[in-house]
Amino acid sequence: MSWIPFKIGQPKKQIVPKTVERDFEREYGKLQQLEEQTRRLQKDMKKSTDADLAMSKSAVKISLDLLSNPLCEQDQDLLNMVTALDTAMKRMDAFNQEKVNQIQKTVIEPLKKFGSVFPSLNMAVKRREQALQDYRRLQAKVEKYEEKEKTGPVLAKLHQAREELRPVREDFEAKNRQLLEEMPRFYGSRLDYFQPSFESLIRAQVVYYSEMHKIFGDLSHQLDQPGHSDEQRERENEAKLSELRALSIVADD
């Protein structure tokens, strides 16, 4: 049998109804989950936009590297092809930057501002917990004197303890009432707050990918050679690769 120590300074009287405590824990638990979800979403959105920018910047660098390749100086068709690619990559990068800026302004920043509210909320909960501990301590003190023989000194101390208890009880009840009223309102406000951000995110993605469809459609028309299917190009590449492999400098020993 395990030993359970007495709780020093704990009142016998149930000063906070269990239903009230359950309601408080439920509402605060929902806000703790919302805080974590907000933090994670902000982090993931930042990682996503950083990856988008890195992708388009890399694509531009690749096209510039191809333009500086000596092969482009020797073949006008190849130069035209790579120039078209470079133009497309720069257009893509420009639209990508616009998209990222829009997401930063209308999604990431609102997420950051929303998340900045939680430290104040958590501090209010801590103040409520401290008020509850003070309430329990003084209630236990009152109960201790109530159980003693009612002598003059004891009655004086009991009166003093009750006077000390009254403002502490009122302070806790006010803090508890305020949190129970405002936590559900705060949680319910998340939909109205975030809906414009998510609509902006969707619009930014739609605009970006619509522009990408145009850019790569134009690029495809510039690069297409009449009468050449993907299968034909693949066969031609394989034939050229076979010719290269036949050279003595790359032949297997």
UniProtKB/Swiss-Prot annotation:
Gene Ontology biological-process annotations: actin cortical patch localization; actin filament organization; cytoskeleton-dependent cytokinesis; endocytosis; myoblast migration involved in skeletal muscle regeneration; plasma membrane tubulation; protein localization; regulation of lamellipodium assembly
GO MF terms on file? Answer: cytoskeletal anchor activity
- State the Pfam families in the record: BAR
* UniProt cross-references to CDD domains, sorted A to Z: BAR_Bin3 (cd07590)
Q: Where is this region: Disordered?
A: 220-240
Q: Where is the BAR domain?
A: 9-232
Q: What is its main location?
A: cytoplasm
Q: Which UniProt keywords apply?
A: Cell cycle, Cell division, Coiled coil, Cytoplasm, Cytoskeleton, Septation
Gene Ontology CC annotation, any one? cytoplasm
What residue ranges carry the coiled-coil annotation?
18-51, 120-152, 231-247
Tissue occurrence? Ubiquitously expressed except in brain.
What the entry lists under Gene3D superfamilies is as follows: Arfaptin homology (AH) domain/BAR domain
The UniProt entry, under SUPFAM superfamilies, shows: BAR/IMD domain-like (SSF103657)
Q: Where in the cell is it found?
A: Cytoplasm, Cytoskeleton
Q: Which pairs of positions does the record mark as disulfide bonds?
A: none
Stretches with biased composition (Basic and acidic residues): 227-240
InterPro entries tied to this protein: AH/BAR_dom_sf (IPR027267), BAR_dom (IPR004148), BIN3/RVS161-like (IPR046982), Bin3_BAR (IPR037428)
Top-rank lineage group of the source organism? Eukaryota
Give the protein's biological function: Involved in cytokinesis and septation where it has a role in the localization of F-actin.
PANTHER family the record matches? BRIDGING INTEGRATOR 3 (PTHR47174:SF3)
| Name of the protein this chain belongs to | Bridging integrator 3
Organism (species): Homo sapiens (Human)
